Amino acid sequence: MDILPSGNIFSELERICTTGYYSSQPSIEDQWQQTCYELERYLRDEPKLQKKMHSNLDNPWDIFSTPARLLEELKIKEQHLDTISTTSSVSSNCSGTSWDSNGSQALSCSVLVKQERIDEEDDDVGCDDKLSVLLAAPPSAISPNPSIGSAGNMTPTSISNSSSISSSNSHSNSNGNTTGSSNIIASPLSSLGSGSTITVSSRNSSAPGIKVRVVQAKNHPGSNARMHLGHVQDFVLPTLTPPSSPESNLRSHNYAQQLEANDLAALIQQQQQQQQQQQQQQQQQQLNPQPGNSTPATAILRFTSQSNPTMTQLQQQQQQLAVQHLSISPQALGHSNIGSNSPKSSSSSSSNSSNSSSSSHSSSSSISGSSDQPTHSNIPRSTIVRLTTANGKPGAAGISLARVIQMQNNGNANVAAVLSAAANSGSSNSNSNSSSSNTSSNSINTATPQQQVLSQRSEKSANGSSKPHHPRQHHSDHSPDAKRRIHKCQFLGCKKVYTKSSHLKAHQRTHTGEKPYKCSWEGCEWRFARSDELTRHYRKHTGAKPFKCRNCDRCFSRSDHLALHMKRHM
Protein backbone atom coordinates (compact mmCIF):
# COMPACT_ATOMS: atom_id res chain seq x y z
CA MET A 1 0.00 0.00 0.00
CA ASP A 2 1.36 3.39 -0.97
CA ILE A 3 1.65 5.62 2.07
CA LEU A 4 3.29 8.89 2.90
CA PRO A 5 6.80 8.41 4.34
CA SER A 6 7.42 9.27 7.95
CA GLY A 7 9.81 8.37 10.72
CA ASN A 8 7.50 5.77 12.26
CA ILE A 9 8.06 3.23 9.51
CA PHE A 10 11.78 3.33 10.06
CA SER A 11 11.41 2.96 13.81
CA GLU A 12 9.18 -0.05 13.27
CA LEU A 13 11.77 -1.64 11.00
CA GLU A 14 14.45 -0.98 13.62
CA ARG A 15 12.31 -2.63 16.27
CA ILE A 16 11.89 -5.72 14.10
CA CYS A 17 15.63 -5.97 13.53
CA THR A 18 16.52 -5.66 17.20
CA THR A 19 13.75 -7.64 18.89
CA GLY A 20 12.74 -10.04 16.15
CA TYR A 21 9.02 -9.34 16.44
CA TYR A 22 6.65 -6.57 15.41
CA SER A 23 4.55 -4.66 17.90
CA SER A 24 0.80 -4.64 17.22
CA GLN A 25 0.53 -0.99 18.05
CA PRO A 26 -1.53 0.59 15.23
CA SER A 27 -0.07 3.47 13.27
CA ILE A 28 -1.58 6.03 10.93
CA GLU A 29 0.01 4.29 7.96
CA ASP A 30 -1.86 1.07 8.62
CA GLN A 31 -5.24 2.76 8.36
CA TRP A 32 -4.35 5.38 5.79
CA GLN A 33 -7.14 4.66 3.30
CA GLN A 34 -9.76 4.45 6.02
CA THR A 35 -8.56 7.71 7.49
CA CYS A 36 -8.73 9.45 4.12
CA TYR A 37 -12.22 8.10 3.55
CA GLU A 38 -13.45 9.37 6.93
CA LEU A 39 -11.85 12.76 6.41
CA GLU A 40 -13.47 13.03 3.00
CA ARG A 41 -16.89 12.28 4.48
CA TYR A 42 -16.32 14.79 7.23
CA LEU A 43 -15.16 17.55 4.88
CA ARG A 44 -17.73 16.87 2.18
CA ASP A 45 -20.19 19.50 3.36
CA GLU A 46 -17.51 22.05 4.18
CA PRO A 47 -17.13 25.08 1.86
CA LYS A 48 -14.82 24.46 -1.05
CA LEU A 49 -11.77 26.52 -1.85
CA GLN A 50 -12.65 28.86 -4.71
CA LYS A 51 -9.08 29.24 -6.00
CA LYS A 52 -6.29 26.73 -5.91
CA MET A 53 -3.37 27.79 -3.72
CA HIS A 54 0.12 26.73 -4.70
CA SER A 55 2.40 25.92 -1.80
CA ASN A 56 5.06 23.46 -0.76
CA LEU A 57 2.33 21.12 0.47
CA ASP A 58 1.69 20.02 -3.11
CA ASN A 59 4.65 17.61 -3.00
CA PRO A 60 4.85 15.78 0.33
CA TRP A 61 8.12 14.06 -0.65
CA ASP A 62 9.96 17.33 -0.16
CA ILE A 63 8.74 17.72 3.42
CA PHE A 64 9.80 14.50 5.05
CA SER A 65 13.39 13.38 5.27
CA THR A 66 15.12 10.31 6.62
CA PRO A 67 16.46 10.70 10.17
CA ALA A 68 20.21 11.19 10.22
CA ARG A 69 20.63 8.75 13.10
CA LEU A 70 19.05 5.93 11.16
CA LEU A 71 21.21 6.62 8.13
CA GLU A 72 24.33 6.48 10.25
CA GLU A 73 23.32 3.18 11.84
CA LEU A 74 22.53 1.65 8.47
CA LYS A 75 25.81 3.02 7.04
CA ILE A 76 24.03 4.88 4.26
CA LYS A 77 25.86 7.97 3.06
CA GLU A 78 23.60 8.96 0.15
CA GLN A 79 20.28 10.64 0.83
CA HIS A 80 18.48 8.90 -2.03
CA LEU A 81 16.79 5.66 -1.11
CA ASP A 82 16.87 4.48 -4.73
CA THR A 83 20.46 3.25 -4.35
CA ILE A 84 19.64 0.88 -1.49
CA SER A 85 20.01 -2.74 -2.55
CA THR A 86 17.13 -5.12 -2.10
CA THR A 87 19.46 -7.51 -0.26
CA SER A 88 20.32 -5.02 2.46
CA SER A 89 18.81 -4.98 5.91
CA VAL A 90 16.37 -2.35 4.80
CA SER A 91 14.53 -4.07 1.96
CA SER A 92 12.82 -1.04 0.57
CA ASN A 93 12.01 -0.33 -3.04
CA CYS A 94 10.54 3.09 -2.40
CA SER A 95 11.53 5.63 -4.99
CA GLY A 96 10.97 9.32 -4.80
CA THR A 97 11.03 9.68 -8.54
CA SER A 98 8.22 7.18 -9.02
CA TRP A 99 5.76 9.84 -7.98
CA ASP A 100 4.75 12.59 -10.34
CA SER A 101 6.63 15.60 -9.06
CA ASN A 102 4.63 18.29 -10.84
CA GLY A 103 1.20 16.66 -10.70
CA SER A 104 0.41 17.61 -14.28
CA GLN A 105 0.60 14.19 -15.88
CA ALA A 106 -2.82 12.82 -16.72
CA LEU A 107 -3.93 9.25 -17.12
CA SER A 108 -4.40 7.98 -20.64
CA CYS A 109 -7.05 5.58 -21.80
CA SER A 110 -8.32 4.26 -25.11
CA VAL A 111 -11.95 4.16 -26.18
CA LEU A 112 -13.25 1.30 -28.29
CA VAL A 113 -16.32 2.05 -30.37
CA LYS A 114 -18.48 -1.02 -30.68
CA GLN A 115 -19.93 -1.66 -34.11
CA GLU A 116 -23.02 -3.79 -34.26
CA ARG A 117 -24.23 -5.84 -37.19
CA ILE A 118 -26.89 -4.29 -39.38
CA ASP A 119 -30.18 -6.12 -39.34
CA GLU A 120 -31.51 -5.40 -42.80
CA GLU A 121 -34.79 -7.16 -42.18
CA ASP A 122 -35.58 -4.98 -39.20
CA ASP A 123 -37.14 -1.71 -40.18
CA ASP A 124 -38.07 1.49 -38.41
CA VAL A 125 -41.74 0.86 -37.81
CA GLY A 126 -42.49 4.29 -36.40
CA CYS A 127 -41.46 6.20 -39.51
CA ASP A 128 -43.17 3.78 -41.91
CA ASP A 129 -46.45 3.96 -40.04
CA LYS A 130 -46.44 7.72 -40.21
CA LEU A 131 -45.50 7.81 -43.88
CA SER A 132 -47.90 5.08 -44.99
CA VAL A 133 -50.88 7.44 -44.86
CA LEU A 134 -49.29 9.84 -47.34
CA LEU A 135 -50.16 9.66 -51.02
CA ALA A 136 -47.26 8.66 -53.24
CA ALA A 137 -47.49 9.75 -56.85
CA PRO A 138 -44.74 10.61 -59.34
CA PRO A 139 -44.98 14.11 -60.79
CA SER A 140 -43.68 12.92 -64.13
CA ALA A 141 -47.04 11.85 -65.52
CA ILE A 142 -48.93 15.05 -64.95
CA SER A 143 -46.42 17.87 -65.10
CA PRO A 144 -45.31 19.70 -68.25
CA ASN A 145 -41.73 20.46 -69.15
CA PRO A 146 -40.67 23.32 -66.87
CA SER A 147 -37.12 24.56 -66.81
CA ILE A 148 -36.17 26.34 -63.64
CA GLY A 149 -33.02 28.16 -62.69
CA SER A 150 -31.20 28.00 -59.41
CA ALA A 151 -33.30 30.78 -57.92
CA GLY A 152 -36.46 28.68 -58.13
CA ASN A 153 -38.29 30.67 -60.84
CA MET A 154 -40.07 28.59 -63.44
CA THR A 155 -39.63 29.32 -67.14
CA PRO A 156 -41.76 27.40 -69.64
CA THR A 157 -39.72 25.67 -72.30
CA SER A 158 -40.56 25.27 -75.96
CA ILE A 159 -43.14 22.63 -76.74
CA SER A 160 -43.29 20.68 -79.97
CA ASN A 161 -46.50 19.77 -81.68
CA SER A 162 -45.80 16.09 -82.23
CA SER A 163 -45.92 13.42 -79.57
CA SER A 164 -45.26 9.73 -79.51
CA ILE A 165 -47.17 7.59 -77.06
CA SER A 166 -46.98 3.86 -77.40
CA SER A 167 -48.99 1.32 -75.48
CA SER A 168 -47.10 -1.40 -73.70
CA ASN A 169 -47.20 -3.36 -70.48
CA SER A 170 -43.56 -3.60 -69.49
CA HIS A 171 -42.62 -5.85 -66.61
CA SER A 172 -39.07 -6.74 -65.62
CA ASN A 173 -37.35 -8.89 -63.01
CA SER A 174 -33.94 -8.47 -61.37
CA ASN A 175 -32.49 -10.72 -58.64
CA GLY A 176 -35.87 -12.10 -57.76
CA ASN A 177 -37.34 -8.69 -57.05
CA THR A 178 -40.73 -8.06 -58.57
CA THR A 179 -41.38 -4.90 -60.51
CA GLY A 180 -43.69 -2.15 -59.42
CA SER A 181 -45.84 0.11 -61.51
CA SER A 182 -47.43 3.47 -61.03
CA ASN A 183 -50.73 4.20 -62.69
CA ILE A 184 -52.11 7.57 -63.62
CA ILE A 185 -55.79 7.95 -64.37
CA ALA A 186 -56.53 10.94 -66.60
CA SER A 187 -59.99 12.32 -67.23
CA PRO A 188 -61.12 13.76 -70.56
CA LEU A 189 -61.02 17.46 -71.25
CA SER A 190 -62.76 19.55 -73.81
CA SER A 191 -60.23 22.36 -73.83
CA LEU A 192 -57.20 23.53 -71.89
CA GLY A 193 -56.69 27.26 -71.92
CA SER A 194 -54.11 29.52 -70.37
CA GLY A 195 -56.24 30.19 -67.30
CA SER A 196 -56.84 26.56 -66.40
CA THR A 197 -55.17 24.69 -63.59
CA ILE A 198 -54.39 21.04 -63.11
CA THR A 199 -55.25 19.10 -59.97
CA VAL A 200 -54.70 15.54 -58.88
CA SER A 201 -56.82 13.62 -56.43
CA SER A 202 -55.81 10.55 -54.48
CA ARG A 203 -56.92 6.96 -55.03
CA ASN A 204 -60.06 7.67 -53.03
CA SER A 205 -62.47 9.76 -55.04
CA SER A 206 -63.63 11.52 -51.87
CA ALA A 207 -60.17 12.90 -51.09
CA PRO A 208 -59.93 16.53 -52.21
CA GLY A 209 -57.24 17.71 -54.57
CA ILE A 210 -54.55 20.17 -53.64
CA LYS A 211 -53.28 22.97 -55.87
CA VAL A 212 -49.58 22.65 -56.53
CA ARG A 213 -46.82 24.11 -58.72
CA VAL A 214 -43.68 22.50 -60.08
CA VAL A 215 -40.65 24.52 -59.10
CA GLN A 216 -37.38 23.11 -60.38
CA ALA A 217 -36.10 20.31 -62.61
CA LYS A 218 -32.73 19.32 -64.04
CA ASN A 219 -31.56 17.25 -66.99
CA HIS A 220 -29.12 14.39 -66.80
CA PRO A 221 -25.80 15.52 -68.29
CA GLY A 222 -25.37 14.22 -71.80
CA SER A 223 -28.99 13.19 -72.34
CA ASN A 224 -30.09 15.18 -75.36
CA ALA A 225 -32.71 12.68 -76.44
CA ARG A 226 -36.33 13.50 -76.02
CA MET A 227 -37.96 12.22 -72.84
CA HIS A 228 -41.20 10.35 -73.52
CA LEU A 229 -44.13 9.90 -71.23
CA GLY A 230 -42.82 6.68 -69.76
CA HIS A 231 -39.91 8.44 -68.07
CA VAL A 232 -39.84 9.71 -64.53
CA GLN A 233 -39.28 13.32 -63.51
CA ASP A 234 -37.77 14.37 -60.23
CA PHE A 235 -37.39 17.82 -58.78
CA VAL A 236 -34.25 19.37 -57.36
CA LEU A 237 -35.55 20.88 -54.16
CA PRO A 238 -34.13 21.66 -50.70
CA THR A 239 -34.00 18.89 -48.16
CA LEU A 240 -36.06 18.59 -45.01
CA THR A 241 -32.98 18.72 -42.77
CA PRO A 242 -31.10 21.88 -41.77
CA PRO A 243 -27.50 22.35 -42.94
CA SER A 244 -26.16 21.42 -39.49
CA SER A 245 -27.67 17.97 -39.70
CA PRO A 246 -25.53 15.06 -41.02
CA GLU A 247 -28.19 14.30 -43.61
CA SER A 248 -27.42 17.57 -45.37
CA ASN A 249 -24.45 16.04 -47.21
CA LEU A 250 -26.82 13.81 -49.16
CA ARG A 251 -27.84 16.64 -51.50
CA SER A 252 -24.96 16.20 -53.94
CA HIS A 253 -25.24 14.65 -57.43
CA ASN A 254 -28.99 15.09 -57.77
CA TYR A 255 -30.23 15.15 -61.36
CA ALA A 256 -33.71 15.10 -62.79
CA GLN A 257 -35.33 14.42 -66.10
CA GLN A 258 -37.88 16.50 -67.89
CA LEU A 259 -41.22 15.44 -69.24
CA GLU A 260 -42.41 17.28 -72.31
CA ALA A 261 -45.81 18.91 -72.15
CA ASN A 262 -46.94 17.87 -75.61
CA ASP A 263 -47.15 14.29 -74.35
CA LEU A 264 -49.72 15.49 -71.88
CA ALA A 265 -51.45 17.40 -74.65
CA ALA A 266 -51.60 14.25 -76.75
CA LEU A 267 -53.13 12.39 -73.85
CA ILE A 268 -55.73 15.13 -73.43
CA GLN A 269 -56.50 14.96 -77.14
CA GLN A 270 -56.98 11.23 -76.86
CA GLN A 271 -59.29 11.67 -73.90
CA GLN A 272 -61.34 14.18 -75.84
CA GLN A 273 -61.97 11.54 -78.47
CA GLN A 274 -63.00 9.11 -75.77
CA GLN A 275 -65.31 11.76 -74.35
CA GLN A 276 -67.12 12.07 -77.65
CA GLN A 277 -67.52 8.31 -77.82
CA GLN A 278 -68.90 8.21 -74.30
CA GLN A 279 -71.40 10.96 -75.01
CA GLN A 280 -72.70 8.85 -77.88
CA GLN A 281 -72.91 5.84 -75.60
CA GLN A 282 -74.77 7.85 -72.97
CA GLN A 283 -77.37 8.84 -75.52
CA GLN A 284 -77.85 5.19 -76.46
CA GLN A 285 -77.99 3.99 -72.85
CA GLN A 286 -80.32 6.57 -71.31
CA LEU A 287 -82.81 3.91 -70.30
CA ASN A 288 -80.11 1.54 -68.97
CA PRO A 289 -77.49 3.67 -67.21
CA GLN A 290 -74.38 1.88 -66.03
CA PRO A 291 -72.71 2.65 -62.70
CA GLY A 292 -69.49 3.55 -64.49
CA ASN A 293 -71.19 6.50 -66.22
CA SER A 294 -71.59 8.39 -62.95
CA THR A 295 -67.96 9.48 -63.13
CA PRO A 296 -66.04 11.01 -66.05
CA ALA A 297 -64.31 8.63 -68.41
CA THR A 298 -60.78 7.85 -67.36
CA ALA A 299 -57.70 6.12 -68.69
CA ILE A 300 -54.69 4.62 -66.98
CA LEU A 301 -51.08 5.67 -67.44
CA ARG A 302 -48.78 2.95 -66.17
CA PHE A 303 -45.08 3.39 -65.52
CA THR A 304 -43.28 0.16 -64.78
CA SER A 305 -40.14 0.46 -62.70
CA GLN A 306 -37.65 -2.13 -61.65
CA SER A 307 -36.96 -2.15 -57.94
CA ASN A 308 -33.35 -1.39 -57.18
CA PRO A 309 -31.83 -4.16 -55.04
CA THR A 310 -28.94 -1.93 -53.96
CA MET A 311 -31.15 0.73 -52.46
CA THR A 312 -31.05 0.62 -48.69
CA GLN A 313 -33.99 0.90 -46.37
CA LEU A 314 -32.84 4.31 -45.20
CA GLN A 315 -32.90 5.67 -48.74
CA GLN A 316 -36.36 4.22 -49.30
CA GLN A 317 -37.56 5.96 -46.13
CA GLN A 318 -36.02 9.21 -47.33
CA GLN A 319 -37.90 8.83 -50.60
CA GLN A 320 -41.20 8.46 -48.76
CA LEU A 321 -40.40 11.49 -46.60
CA ALA A 322 -40.65 14.25 -49.20
CA VAL A 323 -44.40 14.85 -49.50
CA GLN A 324 -45.35 18.46 -50.18
CA HIS A 325 -47.94 20.48 -52.03
CA LEU A 326 -47.00 21.75 -55.48
CA SER A 327 -48.79 23.79 -58.10
CA ILE A 328 -48.38 24.03 -61.88
CA SER A 329 -48.76 27.51 -63.26
CA PRO A 330 -51.31 27.80 -66.08
CA GLN A 331 -48.83 29.66 -68.30
CA ALA A 332 -46.76 26.49 -68.73
CA LEU A 333 -49.80 24.61 -69.97
CA GLY A 334 -51.27 27.43 -72.05
CA HIS A 335 -48.69 27.01 -74.82
CA SER A 336 -49.39 23.31 -75.31
CA ASN A 337 -51.06 22.46 -78.60
CA ILE A 338 -54.36 20.79 -77.86
CA GLY A 339 -55.14 20.17 -81.53
CA SER A 340 -52.13 17.92 -82.13
CA ASN A 341 -53.03 14.39 -83.11
CA SER A 342 -51.23 11.52 -81.43
CA PRO A 343 -49.88 9.10 -84.07
CA LYS A 344 -49.92 6.13 -81.72
CA SER A 345 -52.84 6.56 -79.41
CA SER A 346 -53.84 3.34 -77.79
CA SER A 347 -56.02 2.48 -74.82
CA SER A 348 -58.65 0.01 -73.87
CA SER A 349 -62.34 0.52 -74.44
CA SER A 350 -63.72 3.70 -72.94
CA SER A 351 -66.52 1.90 -71.18
CA ASN A 352 -64.08 -0.12 -69.11
CA SER A 353 -61.72 2.78 -68.43
CA SER A 354 -64.15 4.52 -66.10
CA ASN A 355 -63.87 1.71 -63.58
CA SER A 356 -60.08 1.69 -63.56
CA SER A 357 -59.74 3.31 -60.14
CA SER A 358 -60.99 0.17 -58.41
CA SER A 359 -59.41 -2.34 -60.79
CA SER A 360 -55.98 -3.89 -60.53
CA HIS A 361 -52.98 -2.92 -62.64
CA SER A 362 -53.48 -5.83 -65.01
CA SER A 363 -57.06 -4.89 -65.92
CA SER A 364 -56.32 -1.24 -66.64
CA SER A 365 -55.21 0.23 -69.92
CA SER A 366 -51.62 1.41 -69.95
CA ILE A 367 -49.80 4.11 -71.83
CA SER A 368 -46.05 4.13 -71.40
CA GLY A 369 -42.93 5.13 -73.25
CA SER A 370 -41.33 3.19 -76.05
CA SER A 371 -39.87 -0.19 -75.17
CA ASP A 372 -36.31 0.83 -76.00
CA GLN A 373 -36.27 3.49 -73.30
CA PRO A 374 -34.48 2.58 -70.07
CA THR A 375 -36.52 1.74 -67.02
CA HIS A 376 -35.94 3.94 -63.97
CA SER A 377 -36.11 2.54 -60.50
CA ASN A 378 -37.07 5.66 -58.58
CA ILE A 379 -40.78 5.56 -59.41
CA PRO A 380 -42.77 4.37 -56.40
CA ARG A 381 -44.63 1.12 -56.82
CA SER A 382 -48.43 0.90 -56.86
CA THR A 383 -48.89 4.64 -57.20
CA ILE A 384 -52.08 5.97 -58.78
CA VAL A 385 -52.87 9.59 -59.60
CA ARG A 386 -56.34 10.44 -60.85
CA LEU A 387 -56.90 13.40 -63.12
CA THR A 388 -60.44 14.69 -62.65
CA THR A 389 -62.22 17.79 -63.84
CA ALA A 390 -62.72 20.75 -61.55
CA ASN A 391 -66.48 20.32 -61.27
CA GLY A 392 -66.73 16.61 -62.07
CA LYS A 393 -68.26 17.15 -65.53
CA PRO A 394 -66.64 15.92 -68.74
CA GLY A 395 -66.94 19.36 -70.31
CA ALA A 396 -64.99 21.26 -67.65
CA ALA A 397 -62.19 23.47 -68.88
CA GLY A 398 -59.82 23.26 -65.93
CA ILE A 399 -58.38 20.22 -64.28
CA SER A 400 -56.50 20.42 -61.04
CA LEU A 401 -53.26 18.88 -59.87
CA ALA A 402 -53.16 17.51 -56.34
CA ARG A 403 -50.70 16.03 -53.95
CA VAL A 404 -47.50 14.74 -55.52
CA ILE A 405 -44.66 12.90 -53.79
CA GLN A 406 -41.13 13.70 -54.88
CA MET A 407 -38.90 10.69 -55.18
CA GLN A 408 -35.15 10.64 -54.89
CA ASN A 409 -33.30 10.09 -58.14
CA ASN A 410 -29.86 8.68 -57.40
CA GLY A 411 -30.54 7.06 -54.05
CA ASN A 412 -28.23 9.46 -52.19
CA ALA A 413 -30.25 12.66 -52.22
CA ASN A 414 -33.16 13.78 -50.16
CA VAL A 415 -35.71 15.47 -52.43
CA ALA A 416 -38.24 17.64 -50.71
CA ALA A 417 -41.08 19.63 -52.23
CA VAL A 418 -41.47 23.40 -52.16
CA LEU A 419 -44.77 25.10 -51.44
CA SER A 420 -46.21 27.59 -53.89
CA ALA A 421 -49.54 29.11 -54.68
CA ALA A 422 -51.74 28.05 -57.56
CA ALA A 423 -53.76 30.27 -59.83
CA ASN A 424 -57.49 29.81 -59.83
CA SER A 425 -58.87 28.04 -62.86
CA GLY A 426 -60.97 29.86 -65.44
CA SER A 427 -64.62 29.50 -66.08
CA SER A 428 -65.70 25.96 -67.01
CA ASN A 429 -67.48 25.05 -70.25
CA SER A 430 -70.70 23.09 -69.97
CA ASN A 431 -71.07 21.13 -73.23
CA SER A 432 -73.27 18.30 -71.99
CA ASN A 433 -76.28 17.48 -74.19
CA SER A 434 -79.82 17.80 -72.91
CA SER A 435 -80.57 14.28 -74.09
CA SER A 436 -78.05 12.81 -71.58
CA SER A 437 -79.33 14.82 -68.60
CA ASN A 438 -80.40 11.71 -66.65
CA THR A 439 -76.90 10.27 -66.62
CA SER A 440 -74.89 13.48 -66.32
CA SER A 441 -76.90 14.66 -63.31
CA ASN A 442 -75.54 11.75 -61.30
CA SER A 443 -71.97 12.67 -62.13
CA ILE A 444 -72.59 16.33 -61.23
CA ASN A 445 -74.06 15.42 -57.86
CA THR A 446 -71.19 13.09 -57.17
CA ALA A 447 -68.49 15.68 -57.84
CA THR A 448 -70.21 18.63 -56.12
CA PRO A 449 -68.49 18.19 -52.70
CA GLN A 450 -65.15 17.86 -54.42
CA GLN A 451 -65.77 21.03 -56.39
CA GLN A 452 -66.51 22.98 -53.22
CA VAL A 453 -63.34 21.81 -51.53
CA LEU A 454 -61.27 22.59 -54.61
CA SER A 455 -62.69 26.08 -54.87
CA GLN A 456 -61.87 26.78 -51.22
CA ARG A 457 -58.32 25.55 -51.65
CA SER A 458 -57.84 27.56 -54.81
CA GLU A 459 -58.86 30.75 -52.99
CA LYS A 460 -56.38 30.05 -50.22
CA SER A 461 -53.59 29.34 -52.67
CA ALA A 462 -54.42 32.42 -54.73
CA ASN A 463 -54.11 34.60 -51.62
CA GLY A 464 -50.74 33.10 -50.76
CA SER A 465 -49.29 33.40 -54.27
CA SER A 466 -48.15 37.00 -53.75
CA LYS A 467 -45.85 36.08 -50.86
CA PRO A 468 -42.19 35.54 -51.75
CA HIS A 469 -41.13 31.94 -51.54
CA HIS A 470 -38.27 30.83 -49.32
CA PRO A 471 -36.62 27.40 -49.66
CA ARG A 472 -36.93 26.71 -45.93
CA GLN A 473 -40.64 27.56 -45.69
CA HIS A 474 -41.82 23.98 -45.93
CA HIS A 475 -42.90 24.13 -42.28
CA SER A 476 -46.05 25.98 -43.36
CA ASP A 477 -47.42 22.78 -44.85
CA HIS A 478 -50.88 21.78 -43.68
CA SER A 479 -49.86 18.17 -43.19
CA PRO A 480 -48.70 17.41 -39.61
CA ASP A 481 -46.26 14.77 -40.84
CA ALA A 482 -44.63 17.25 -43.20
CA LYS A 483 -43.94 19.61 -40.29
CA ARG A 484 -42.10 16.89 -38.40
CA ARG A 485 -38.42 16.79 -39.20
CA ILE A 486 -36.92 13.36 -38.72
CA HIS A 487 -33.17 13.08 -38.13
CA LYS A 488 -31.94 9.51 -38.06
CA CYS A 489 -28.55 8.37 -36.83
CA GLN A 490 -26.52 7.04 -39.76
CA PHE A 491 -24.03 4.95 -37.80
CA LEU A 492 -24.02 1.22 -38.38
CA GLY A 493 -26.59 -0.62 -36.33
CA CYS A 494 -28.00 2.51 -34.66
CA LYS A 495 -31.71 3.27 -35.08
CA LYS A 496 -32.01 6.43 -33.01
CA VAL A 497 -34.34 9.08 -34.47
CA TYR A 498 -34.52 12.69 -33.24
CA THR A 499 -36.71 15.65 -34.11
CA LYS A 500 -33.88 18.18 -33.65
CA SER A 501 -30.53 18.14 -35.37
CA SER A 502 -28.76 19.34 -32.20
CA HIS A 503 -30.02 16.30 -30.33
CA LEU A 504 -28.79 14.07 -33.13
CA LYS A 505 -25.32 15.65 -33.08
CA ALA A 506 -25.10 15.18 -29.31
CA HIS A 507 -26.05 11.54 -29.76
CA GLN A 508 -23.49 11.00 -32.51
CA ARG A 509 -20.70 12.02 -30.14
CA THR A 510 -21.37 8.80 -28.27
CA HIS A 511 -20.27 6.97 -31.43
CA THR A 512 -17.28 9.16 -32.29
CA GLY A 513 -16.02 9.78 -28.74
CA GLU A 514 -15.72 13.51 -29.37
CA LYS A 515 -15.71 15.71 -26.24
CA PRO A 516 -15.73 19.36 -27.28
CA TYR A 517 -16.73 20.85 -23.89
CA LYS A 518 -13.70 21.41 -21.61
CA CYS A 519 -13.81 22.46 -18.00
CA SER A 520 -12.46 25.99 -17.59
CA TRP A 521 -11.50 25.52 -13.95
CA GLU A 522 -7.82 26.07 -13.30
CA GLY A 523 -5.96 22.79 -13.23
CA CYS A 524 -8.96 20.71 -14.34
CA GLU A 525 -8.59 18.72 -17.55
CA TRP A 526 -12.04 17.14 -17.73
CA ARG A 527 -13.83 17.17 -21.08
CA PHE A 528 -17.43 16.26 -21.89
CA ALA A 529 -19.52 15.42 -24.93
CA ARG A 530 -22.56 17.40 -23.76
CA SER A 531 -22.85 20.86 -22.31
CA ASP A 532 -25.19 19.81 -19.50
CA GLU A 533 -22.58 17.33 -18.29
CA LEU A 534 -20.03 20.15 -18.15
CA THR A 535 -22.44 22.34 -16.19
CA ARG A 536 -23.07 19.54 -13.73
CA HIS A 537 -19.32 18.97 -13.33
CA TYR A 538 -18.58 22.67 -12.87
CA ARG A 539 -20.84 22.78 -9.82
CA LYS A 540 -18.40 20.43 -8.09
CA HIS A 541 -15.77 23.17 -8.27
CA THR A 542 -18.00 26.04 -7.26
CA GLY A 543 -20.10 24.11 -4.76
CA ALA A 544 -23.29 25.59 -6.19
CA LYS A 545 -26.53 23.84 -5.28
CA PRO A 546 -29.29 25.58 -7.22
CA PHE A 547 -31.96 22.92 -6.65
CA LYS A 548 -33.64 23.56 -3.30
CA CYS A 549 -36.30 21.42 -1.70
CA ARG A 550 -39.53 23.32 -1.16
CA ASN A 551 -40.41 21.21 1.87
CA CYS A 552 -37.14 21.58 3.74
CA ASP A 553 -33.90 23.56 3.63
CA ARG A 554 -31.80 21.02 1.77
CA CYS A 555 -30.22 22.01 -1.55
CA PHE A 556 -28.79 19.85 -4.29
CA SER A 557 -26.47 20.38 -7.22
CA ARG A 558 -28.40 18.03 -9.52
CA SER A 559 -32.07 17.93 -10.35
CA ASP A 560 -32.29 14.15 -10.23
CA HIS A 561 -30.94 14.19 -6.69
CA LEU A 562 -33.68 16.63 -5.75
CA ALA A 563 -36.27 14.38 -7.37
CA LEU A 564 -35.08 11.43 -5.29
CA HIS A 565 -35.16 13.56 -2.18
CA MET A 566 -38.70 14.75 -2.91
CA LYS A 567 -39.92 11.16 -2.71
CA ARG A 568 -39.13 11.18 1.00
CA HIS A 569 -41.70 13.88 1.60
CA MET A 570 -44.45 11.96 -0.18
Curated annotation (Swiss-Prot):
Keywords of this entry: Cell cycle, Cell division, Developmental protein, Metal-binding, Mitosis, Nucleus, Repeat, Zinc, Zinc-finger
GO CC terms of this entry: nucleus
InterPro entries for this protein: Znf_C2H2_sf, Znf_C2H2_type
Biased composition (Basic and acidic residues): 474-483
Gene3D superfamilies reported for this sequence: Classic Zinc Finger (3.30.160.60)
Keyword Cell division: yes
Primary residence: nucleus
Zinc finger (C2H2-type) in chain: 487-511, 517-541, 547-569
Polar residues composition bias: residue spans: 287-297, 372-383, 448-466
GO molecular function, one term: sequence-specific DNA binding
Gene Ontology BP annotations: cell division; mitotic sister chromatid segregation; preblastoderm mitotic cell cycle; regulation of transcription by RNA polymerase II
Location(s) in or outside the cell: Nucleus
Pfam families linked to this entry: zf-C2H2 (PF00096)
Biased composition (Low complexity): 269-286, 335-371, 424-447
SUPFAM superfamilies: beta-beta-alpha zinc fingers
Record carries keyword Coiled coil: no
Start and end residues of each stretch annotated as Disordered: 138-182, 268-297, 332-383, 424-483
Job description of the protein: Probable transcription factor that is required for cell differentiation. Essential for proper separation of the sister chromatids during early nuclear division cycles in the syncytial pre-blastoderm embryo.
Family: Belongs to the krueppel C2H2-type zinc-finger protein family.
Misc remark: Named 'luna' based upon mutant embryo phenotype in which large vacuoles formed in the egg yolk resemble the lunar surface.
Protein name as catalogued: Krueppel-like factor luna
Natural source organism: Drosophila melanogaster
